[in-house]
């Protein structure tokens, strides 16, 4: 989905939230961190990604459309917090104590590592594999690696190699 297919009102709400939280952080931290670049090119089941070196936030337009209010309230500050932590502390654990502090004490948002959005519309096809204790669903990428002989996957519970059903 291209940015142009995302309603302008939603894009504006995202920018408002981003700017509001950035201003709040700059005030509390006594800094003047710049506004990050924003794109709507994230794909798959991730709601967003913070690209530290390029100081950019990628958001998933499908999940944003389907969960606008929660997405804007939670995901936008979540990704902004990653960039602010990187600027403020340098390279640290992605969801470590610095990120949690930035989320809760600076941005005033509950620090949750993962979203709870329905993923049916963005979930890719999977391929069934088995071990001796359960069935597993491998992504297209992992399935293709098995088919090409580039990878072998094992069950984390029983340790047995996964085989296609």
Swiss-Prot record:
It is found in: Cytoplasm. Belongs to the SprT family. One of its GO terms (biological process) is response to stress. Its cofactor is Zn(2+). SMART domains: SprT (SM00731). Residues 20-163 form the SprT-like domain. It comes from Shigella boydii serotype 18 (strain CDC 3083-94 / BS512). PROSITE patterns: ZINC_PROTEASE. The gene is sprT. One of its GO terms (molecular function) is zinc ion binding. The lineage of its organism: Bacteria, Pseudomonadati, Pseudomonadota, Gammaproteobacteria, Enterobacterales. Binds 1 zinc ion. NCBIfam families: PRK04860.1. This is Protein SprT. One of its GO terms (cellular component) is cytoplasm. Its main location: cytoplasm. Keywords: Cytoplasm, Metal-binding, Zinc. The active site is at 79. InterPro entries: SprT-like_domain, SprT_Zn_ribbon, Uncharacterised_SprT. Zn(2+) binds at residues 78, 82. It comes from the Bacteria. PANTHER family: PROTEIN SPRT.
């Amino acid at each position: 989905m291209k940015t142009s297919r995302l309603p302008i009102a939603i894009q504006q709400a995202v920018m408002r939230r981003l700017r509001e939280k950035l201003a709040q952080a700059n005030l509390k931290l006594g800094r003047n961190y710049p506004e990050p670049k924003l794109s709507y090119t994230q794909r798959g089941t991730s709601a967003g990604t913070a690209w530290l070196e390029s100081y950019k936030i990628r958001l998933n337009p499908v999940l944003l459309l389907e969960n606008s209010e929660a997405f804007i309230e939670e995901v936008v500050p979540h990704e902004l917090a990653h960039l602010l932590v990187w600027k403020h502390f340098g390279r640290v654990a992605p969801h470590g104590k610095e990120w949690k502090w930035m989320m809760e004490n600076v941005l005033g948002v509950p620090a949750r590592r993962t979203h709870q959005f329905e993923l049916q519309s963005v979930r890719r096809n999977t391929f069934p594999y088995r071990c001796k204790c359960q069935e597993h669903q491998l992504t297209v990428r992992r399935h293709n690696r098995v088919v090409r002989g580039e990878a072998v996957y094992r069950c984390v519970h029983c340790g047995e190699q996964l085989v296609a059903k």
